[in-house]
A protein has these predicted regions:
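ATP/NTP phosphate-donor binding region
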Residues: 1-61, 73, 101-118, 126-137
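Short glycine-rich anion-binding loops that position phosphate/pyrophosphate groups of nucleotides
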Residues: 10, 68-70, 91, 179-181
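Proline-centered loop/turn at the N-terminus of a beta-strand
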Residues: 31, 82-84
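N-terminal glycine-rich "phosphate-gripper" loop used for MgATP/nucleotide binding
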Residues: 60, 64-68, 75-77
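ATP/nucleoside-binding phosphotransfer catalytic cores, i.e., glycine-rich phosphate-binding loops
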Residues: 145, 150, 161-164, 212-282
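Gly/Ser/Thr-rich active-site loops/lids in small-molecule metabolic enzymes
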Residues: 166-211
Length: 282
């Protein structure tokens, strides 16, 4: 088995956890590598170092080390190549982690193929001018649409399958996957949705209304979002650098053509993980 490691070295624990993973993989006889940018930090591990595309295209699995943000970033790189990913927690909650840093002995199950794949729905967002796509991205958790001037409310029109659905006066709207229902969506008052229930969630942020609530749509829904006032909006995918939706343009959000495939080595289910992780916040 060929494995690519993608650690987030801004996490103080990540370097040590990654070194431990390297030791475990070496003992198990697995081939593992990093992308070239990690050469200085991990040259002593005996790993190979390759350009990003070569490493990811040629691997059998990806191991991401860090918190949820790091794992989600790596999951997108893996998903577009139809590669499975295992998250190892070196952050705080890390809902997406399949292993904690004290469970590296379980990596033997990965090498032996003793695991299941947890296939998670992803979203694709296109920024369009008419029928022309002028920008696009994918997300594992959510995409956030706000006014370009973040401190101001904005009027946002939302259409469902090409039919005008609602207009929100709010700070923004959040479109989430079931995976993202335990992230920003949860903080914004959205429902927790089991990831096995494929669906798309829409949550208005601080709506100036007595009735606006989160909504759950079927997985083949296509949501179109644009400014009701001709203002410039911003849309960001999983919290990364936002793209601009200029006046006369709109964002179209729908199910992606592939899934994020998370490796599950342990037998804990969604409710087990939810209770364990959120109990840490009490």
């Amino acid at each position: 088995m060929k494995i690519v490691l993608i650690p987030n070295l801004t996490r103080k624990e990540a370097a040590g956890v990654t070194a431990g993973i390297c030791q475990s993989l070496k003992k198990l006889g697995a081939d593992f590598c990093f992308t070239d940018e990690y050469r200085n930090e991990f040259e002593h591990t005996g790993a190979a170092f390759l350009p990003e595309n070569e490493a990811l295209d040629g691997c059998d699995a990806v191991i991401a080390v860090g918190g949820d943000g790091s794992i989600i970033h790596a999951a997108k790189l893996a998903a577009v190549r139809h590669k499975p990913i295992l998250g190892v927690n070196a952050g705080r909650l890390a809902f997406m982690a399949g292993l904690e840093d004290n469970e590296l002995h379980l990596l033997s199950r990965l090498i032996e193929g003793d695991y299941t794949l947890d296939k998670r729905l992803m979203l694709k967002m296109n920024i369009k001018r008419g029928n022309e796509i002028i920008g696009s991205d994918y997300c594992v958790n959510d995409c956030l649409i706000t006014n370009e001037e973040k401190q101001r409310m904005t009027a946002i029109d939302v259409s469902l399958n090409s039919s005008r659905f609602n207009s929100y006066l709010c700070d923004g709207v959040l479109i989430s996957t079931p995976t993202g229902s335990t992230a920003y969506s949860l903080s914004a008052g959205g429902p927790v949705v089991d990831p096995e229930l494929e669906s798309i969630l829409l949550t208005p942020l601080c709506p100036h209304s007595l009735v606006d609530r989160s909504l759950i749509f079927r997985p083949d829904a296509v949501l179109t979002v644009e400014s009701a006032e001709g203002n410039t909006l911003c849309i960001s995918s999983d919290g990364v650098q936002p793209l601009t939706i200029e006046s006369g343009c709109y964002a179209e959000v729908s199910r992606a053509e592939f899934t994020a495939n998370f490796i599950r080595i342990k037998s804990d289910n969604f409710i087990d993980i939810l209770y364990k992780k959120l109990a840490q916040r009490r």
